[in-house]
Amino acid sequence: MNQSGKRDSWASRAGFVLACIGSAVGMGNIWLFPSRVSAYGGATFLIPYLIFVALIGSTGVIGEMAFGRATRSGPIHAFGQATKRRCGSERPGRALGFIPVLGSLAMAIGYSVVVGWIFNYLAASFTGGLNGLADVGAFTARFDATAAGNAPWQIAGMLITLTIMALGVGGGIEKANKLMMPLFFVLFLGLAVYLAFLPGSATGYRYIFILDPKGLADPMVWVYALGQAFFSLSIAGNGTLIYGSYLSEDSDIPADARLVAVFDTLAALVAALVIIPAMALAGQELTQSGPGLMFIFLPNVLRGIPGGGIILMVFFTAVTFAALTSLINLFEAPVATLQELFHLSRPVAVALIGAVGIGVGLAISPIVSQWMDVCSIYICPLGALLAAVMFFWVWGKDDALAQVNQARKKPLGRWFYPLAKYLFCGVTLLVLVLGAVMGGIG
């Protein structure tokens, strides 16, 4: 809510779509997607990945956006309204609604540690601190030192995030995403084009676009493609739902969801078109993922490419934009929840959540990997499943379809509701089970 007590809203459709893209485009697109494309056969991985993006984008993303707009609230009130309609009481829904809210806060706290690392490397790329490192061992030592002395950078990243959020949905979040997301794509596309003209980069494209039909019979290709698509689209019952709650009544949600899915996929592909050819230029295969790829192996490779110093600056600037827009979204559900539950002004709610985020974030920094695993393996898919069940099973078919099709000239076909109610909910449960059994798939 804004200072007058009215709920904040997006100033434009472009602002909403770019904010949702900013939420979806994150570290998974950059440090995980390229390595999975390389490891699981290029186009052999892309085929199931695109299938799952189409499924989730046309059901789960639409559902969370529509649920948010229908209830004009975050998960706690939204879930409560759903159970009140079905069984006459908000209490069970409100209790369950705390799961995605607390999950979003926990994920944001862990993510703030990573943002601190990124800020550290961004500064080092501009001061030349990365250029003098001789090999992977030197980069490993630097990253270990970064992780141990990250507090100032972590706090700096949090202060920038909180300042943007305190300015409001339209005045802060929307304007920040309108600036950072286009720049992210421009910078990464620029890197991709530059690398394409360097001798030896063609080998990298073969890793991306090669197709082995036999590989499609490997169940692990489908499992990891599902995990990549699911987590990349920011489905967790919190961020997309809360962004949807700021939508106007004349927003075409299915069209907006389609744009988010398309541009999130493009971001992942562009990242692959930068990272895989870069590794090929250095005569190396992409065998690493996660922080090790982004903070150790990739900087070592980029440093040795012609124009490496500038490439490092551009790369970490683009990564910073992706990280900040994702962190803003993760903190938005807890901030909005404080506003709704205690009728606080936005700056006060942001300050309280920010204090918790900084304090806990500094404390869990040494165990951030395990912290993030718990969030991504258990809490995020559970939140997504709860939101899907509340909207597609509890809310009611007629009202759910009315909200999804509102402002559309051509309503979605009869295929949508059963696809969302049965297949998407089933797939979300599968993500939760597979993640728990396998120790994570996304």
Regions inferred by a protein language model and the residue ranges of each:
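Membrane-interface "cap" regions at the ends of multi-pass membrane proteins
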Residues: M1-L32, G60-M65, R69-A95, S248-D252, ...
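Inter-helical loop and helix-membrane interface segments of multi-pass membrane transporters/permeases
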Residues: S4-R7, R36-Y40, S73-L102, S112-G170, ...
